[in-house]
Every structure is written in C-alpha cells, then in structure tokens.
Amino acid sequence: MISLTPSLFLNKTVVPGCSTRLSLRQPRTIITPPASLRVFSSLGSNQDPTGSVLIETTATSSSSLETSAADIVPKSTVSGGVQDVYGEDAATEDMPITPWSLSVASGYTLLRDPHHNKGLAFSHRERDAHYLRGLLPPTVISQDLQVKKIMHTLRQYQVPLQKYMAMMDLQETNERLFYKLLIDHVEELLPVIYTPTVGEACQKYGSIFLRPQGLFISLKEKGKIHEVLRNWPEKNIQVIVVTDGERILGLGDLGCQGMGIPVGKLSLYTALGGVRPSACLPVTIDVGTNNEKLLNDEFYIGLRQRRATGEEYSELMHEFMTAVKQNYGEKVVIQFEDFANHNAFDLLAKYGTTHLVFNDDIQGTASVVLAGLIAALRFVGGSLSDHRFLFLGAGEAGTGIAELIALEISKKSHIPLEEARKNIWLVDSKGLIVSSRKESIQHFKKPWAHDHEPIRELVDAVKAIKPTVLIGTSGVGQTFTQDVVETMAKLNEKPIILSLSNPTSQSECTAEEAYTWSQGRAIFASGSPFAPVEYEGKTFVPGQANNAYIFPGFGLGLIMSGTIRVHDDMLLAASEALAEELMEEHYEKGMIYPPFRNIRKISARIAAKVAAKAYELGLATRLPQPKELEQCAESSMYSPSYRSYR
C-alpha cells in the first residue's frame, strides 16, 4: 500500500486592518453578550487599503459601544460615498460602495448566530442579559426536549431528502443542537446525513442550494488560493476534507455539487470523532464537469465547462496544497474524498511525503473492511493467510483493501508482501486481472496480475479461483447474481460476502439476497445500510462496512498526537482496534461490526491506538506522550451541550 508521509505547518494568519472611517462621539455604556463585535463581511487582502474585513473581539467586560444616528459625524464616509444623517452612503447605484454593518451578537443577531443560538433553551436570565425578551416565546425548554421535538418532526417526513434538508437547515441555525441530535440518534440519522441520502443530495444540490457551506475553489481562483483560504472565518483548522467531485460515491461526476460529501464527512468528524466544528474546513475544487446533464442544468452552481485535466489541473491542486500548508501548518489533516482513480493515486503518492494526507476511499475503506474480516474469522476460523479473496472492482477501494489485507497477512505470517498478494485476485470490467493483461492495465492494478488464463465472467472466476471471501467494490448494482452467491455457498460452509458499493441502488446485492441464496450461511456486510433479515425463523443483522467507523477516530488520533505523517501501520492499528469492539452478543446475530450507538467510545479507542502507533514510530510531535491516551482522546472531544452565557 502507498505509505503516506504528511507534513504541514501551523501558523496564525493576521487579520488585515479595517479601513472604515467612522467618527463617533462619546460612547455610551451598555451590557453586551459574551459573543463578538462584528464589523463587516469578509477578509480582505493586505494589499487592499479599503478591503472589507471581519473583526471579532471577545468581550471581556460588560461594556460596548452604542450609537444613534445623531452620534455620527455627518460627513464621515465609507468607501468614498457621501454619508447622510442616518450613517448611510447617499450614493447612486453606479457609485461603488463598501457594504458594511456594525452589530453586536445579542438580541436578534444572537438568535441568528448558529454558533451561539440556543433557541427556546435561553434561560430567563440570559434573555434579560442579552436583549432577547420579546424575541422568543415565554417558555424555556431544555436541550433534551428540543432534541425530542426535532426527532418527532423528522419522523413525519417520508422522503429521506426532506430529512437531510431539515438537518442541514438546523446545522445553519443551531450548531450545538444539530450535533446533539446527531450524537444521540446516530444510528437513525447517519443514513440521513451521509450515505445513502447524501448521494441524492449531491445530485440535486443545485436545486436545493440555499446557502453556501464550505469553501469553493475554482479555476477562476487560480493564483489567488492563498487569499481565498484567508476568506474562511476560522483560522485554527485541524481537518480539511477536499473533493473535486469527479467520482461522487457510485454516482460519477457531479462537479461542484460534490460539496455535500466534504460537508457530510466533517459533520461526522465532529459528531463521531469529537473534532471541533470550527476546526473543520470542507473544500470543493471546481475544475468543471463532464456531466452533460449538469452542464445543461439551469440550476447547476459550478463552472459550466468541460473538466480541466493534465497540467492545468495539477497546477491548481499544487497551489491549493501549498496554500493549505502556508495557512494552517504541517499538522492539519487533509482528507482526499471522491477523486477519480487516476488522480486519487497520483495525489496520494505526490503529497504523501510532504503533507499529512489521507484518502478515505483508498485507506479508510481498506481499514474498515480489514476490521470486518478480522472479526469474521471468529465464524470461519483460521487466519487471513488461510483464506482466498476475490474482488469485483479494481479501483481505489478494491486495490486499497487488497493491499491492506496483504500487508496484514505479511506482518502476521512473516512472509514477503509479494507472497501475501498471491491469495488475492481482482476482477475489473474486462474480467480477471491476469499476467497476460499486465501491459494494458493501470499501474495500481499490476501487483494483482497473477498467472492464470483469462476469465471474462465473475461467476466463472468464482468457480476457478474458489474464494472464501467475495468483496464487491464495482459501483455496479446487482452484479452478485444468484448464480454467484449460490456458487460461493457451494464452495464454503460460511461464505464471506461483502457488498460495499454505495449508494444502496449500486450495491452488488442486498442483504436479503445474500442470506436467502446462501441458505442463511453467508457472513454478510454492505456499504449502505440494510434492515435486519429473517430467514427460516432466525434474524440476521447485516453489518455496514461504513468508513465512519474509522476516519473520525483515525483523524482524532492524528490530531491529538500531532502526527506529521500517516503510516500504513496506523491503518492496521485502527482495524484491529475496531475488530476488538465486537462482543459475544454481536456474533450471535451474525454481526462483524459493532452497533453505531457506541461510536464515540469506539472512536476514542481507535484514536488512542492510532496515536500510540504514531508515538511508537516517532511520527508524533505532541510531547511528552500522555499516559492514558484513551482518556486523553475522550477529554479532547467536542461537547454539543449548551454553554451558559454571562
């Protein structure tokens, strides 16, 4: 597997100065909330003397400024306009002005600040102190009751996309309540926030787009990406999830509308891994799209051009990666998400030695699948080296999983990696990958080209290779046909079948099909969720090989240890930590993944194992090493509970 070597620098960006020329008379003293004084909209560049700025100063006392229209000197101006008695520029529409506002986060403004808003949970004392009287109904309710109320509302919706939109709206109005809701009801809401619903949300992103989430960097920003990153209001970024939208789940090229993926992933970093929301930055790199339907869609929000490739693409990505390091330092995690195969492998290889990069499609998927296979050994016995693996799909996920399995076999059995690969076979769109095809296949497939006669059909490959484990990463639905599953069941007492493609419509087979066609003997897991299946009086609970088991805890482990490079051994440590979470009660139901309801505890344990491995390898920079890493992970997690305001 590709060994990653990341490095980033953490430096603090200086906020440019504000040039709005306001002359104020003697200020009056009033009580202010513990929020911030906001002057203006976005961050301007250092070269712009009249650049628009956002200034935030935390209130340390109970005094602030209050002015009336009469307090403003009539001739003071903003960006050259002629100011009237009300402090507004009396300019024509043709005269450029600087749009600005002066507000304190209290009262009406406080209710519309998602970071501080508590809705009806503001106490009577807080309502008096922060000018909220009359702006809210008189009742005061707890955060728990708010959660109960919203869950009641969400359950009235019949369409998953409606639930998704309601959750995104909540995130933009009351951040802490959003995360409280997601943490408390993670098993029910995870399919809403992420797969499979996020796939439909990305497909319809232009139609449902209301307000921007994340940072959009297009070819139009080439040469200015450093300044664009400074427009983001938060400066202490710890995790970036970035996509170029070319391979969104199993849905293909969705261009700029792939932003739903970074937003969703980072929501899970916070809810499941405890990374602060303010430390997360979703980014979409827009280089166009080859999706004709989107190019002709009047609601499409991205560049209306064919996708840039080659040098133009590489230069934009290199500028982005360089700017990230300059702005946020060398210890920020950069997670590549849903890039096309060729770019995914190239970016990982190119920046693995200079940045702290992680590809969830290659490495996260591999780690969670390996965890499931380790757990499945409880049912089938033996070690991984005793099994034979056949993959349908030889892209990022397929080759990434195959390489991590081979690495685990190599380490546990003390055999060369090349020898460990011989029990792993891959099938792509042209059939079984064999030595005779070596000259015509992509470089990342070549390690899996073994000596064998060519085979075109999957069912024939199953009969010839006789695998004990069948893994689907093809992105093509219904490819594990009845013939394929029945053949696996004839060859094995307990065939392991993993149908990993997302979303549900692209799954190689359903849970019901796997259990029925194998007479209830299959050990099954999927990429998208399936309901429990009853077969001949026994209830089977299909596992979901969801990357959300791994990447939140993995990222937290990197952050808490100050790791400067991702190493393959960290992925193995994460897999083993997840497999250890299975209890006897889970095995009795045929499960190879633990329930999601304990995901924060699981993430803390994964983080501890990843951090421990980083310290062992000498890649951690946060010294000295904490004695209790799991306790350290738990204590560093973000809490969504409301805070009391003075």
UniProtKB/Swiss-Prot annotation:
Gene: NADP-ME4
Active site positions: 194, 265
Site residues (Important for activity), renumbered to this chain: 361
Expression sites by tissue: Expressed in leaves, stems, flowers and roots, mainly in vascular system. In roots, present in the stele, including the vascular tissue and the pericycle, mainly at emerging lateral roots and at root tips.
Catalytic reaction annotation: (S)-malate + NADP(+) = pyruvate + CO2 + NADPH; oxaloacetate + H(+) = pyruvate + CO2
Alphabetically ordered keywords of this record: Chloroplast, Metal-binding, NADP, Oxidoreductase, Plastid, Transit peptide
Disulfide-linked positions: none
Protein's name according to its UniProt entry: NADP-dependent malic enzyme 4, chloroplastic
Record GO biological process: fatty acid biosynthetic process; malate metabolic process
Free-text cofactor note: Divalent metal cations. Prefers magnesium or manganese.
UniProt family annotation: Belongs to the malic enzymes family.
Quaternary data: Homodimer and homotetramer.
Transit peptide start and end: 1-74
Residues holding NADP(+): 247, 361, 390-406, 502
Keyword DNA repair: no
The enzyme's E.C. designation: 1.1.1.40
Coiled-coil ranges (or none): none
GO molecular function: cobalt ion binding; malate dehydrogenase (decarboxylating) (NADP+) activity; NAD binding; oxaloacetate decarboxylase activity; zinc ion binding
Subcellular localization, as worded in the UniProt entry: Plastid, Chloroplast
